[in-house]
Structure formats: structure tokens, C-alpha cells
Regions:
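Short alpha-helix boundary/capping motifs
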Residues: 31-34, 60, 83
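A broad, low-specificity signal for short, low-complexity segments enriched in glycine/proline
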Residues: 12-15, 60-65
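C-terminal cap/substrate-recognition subdomain and adjoining C-terminal extension
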Residues: 62-156
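Short, acidic loop-to-helix structural element flanking the phosphoryl-transfer center
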Residues: 22-51
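Intrinsic disorder/low-complexity segments
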Residues: 6-8, 50, 154
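Asp-based phosphoryl-transfer active-site loop
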Residues: 1-23
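Residue-level signal for short, function-critical loop segments
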Residues: 57
């Protein structure tokens, strides 16, 4: 999330994004993690999960800013995937074919129409567990054991 959102409630952060009222929103290299996300992802990786990241950015220049943030905050190593300018969200996922997608509900930018999973082909959706979290709420509430993640599947 943008650095100036640190002390605010989830709803206020969503409002900041919708209204574009904070200059740090577009300062991608200064983004900060939500909650204990690095700890949770490291725990899952240590259990054998292969962690991949899907960037919202459309250019390699901005994806490199994501990489800076991931390294700075010691996120587990993983490939960062992103879509090209004219591509839909589903294309990077169709290449990766993950077992599980954890994504936020995109409340501040239009909801499920901006999400990845709802835009996947039905035959791919049937092979992937979708877990949706509230935007800016983090993943701390998800189980530590990767075998329990499927219990948190979200129907869209």
C-alpha cells in the first residue's frame, strides 16, 4: 500500500485511492507491506509453496519498482508477472497456471471487474482456488498451513 496510508483505516485508504488525494499513491517504489505479509508468505514458501507475484503495472520500469519494494521488505523470492498494455488480467495467469490465487477485492478501482480470477476462462477457474481478501486488509487472517488455504476459497 502507499506509504502515507500506514496509520489509516482500511476504508479511509480505499477513499484515498478513489479520490486520489495522496501523492504517495503514485510513488510505487515507496510502497509498504500490509500487516505481516512477508512472514506469512515465507511460512508458506517454507512449506513448499512457489510464490509468484502479479503486478498491476504495465511497464517493466514500474515492475522494477515492485521488485525494489519486495527486496526492501524481504518478501520471499518469486517471479513478478505483469500484463502488457493491451493485455487482459487473465493472460499472465494463463501462463503461470497457479493452484491458488490470493487477490484483493479491488474495491477502490471497480470491484470484481478489475480482479483476475473472475476474468479467467471457466476451464481455468475450475483448476484454481480463488481466495479474495478485502482490499488493504492483508492476509494475516489466512491460515499458516498451506494445506488449509483451500478452506478459504471464495465463490464469485
Amino acid at each position: 500500500m502507499h506509504r502515507n496510508a500506514f496509520a489509516f483505516s482500511r476504508l479511509l485508504i480505499v477513499q484515498q485511492i478513489i479520490e486520489g488525494i495522496d501523492e504517495s499513491i503514485s510513488d510505487f517504489a515507496s510502497y509498504i507491506p500490509i500487516g505481516n505479509v512477508t512472514k506469512k508468505l515465507t511460512l508458506w514458501q517454507n512449506q513448499g509453496a512457489k510464490i509468484s507475484y502479479l503486478s498491476s503495472h504495465l511497464t517493466l520500469e514500474n515492475v522494477k519498482k515492485d521488485e525494489i519494494v519486495l527486496k526492501k521488505f524481504k518478501f520471499p523470492k518469486g517471479t513478478i508477472f505483469y500484463r502488457q498494455k493491451e493485455e487482459d488480467w487473465n493472460l499472465p495467469i494463463e501462463k503461470v497456471k497457479p493452484d491458488i490465487i490470493i487477490e484483493d477485492d479491488c474495491e477502490s478501482i471497480g470491484g470484481k471487474y478489475q480482479m483476475t480470477f473472475p476474468n479467467l476462462k471457466p476451464e481455468l477457474q475450475s483448476k484454481i482456488t480463488s481466495i479474495v481478501v478485502k482490499e488493504f486488509a492483508g492476509i494475516d487472517h489466512l491460515p499458516d498451513d498451506i494445506n488449509d488455504l483451500k478452506d478459504f476459497a471464495t465463490e464469485l
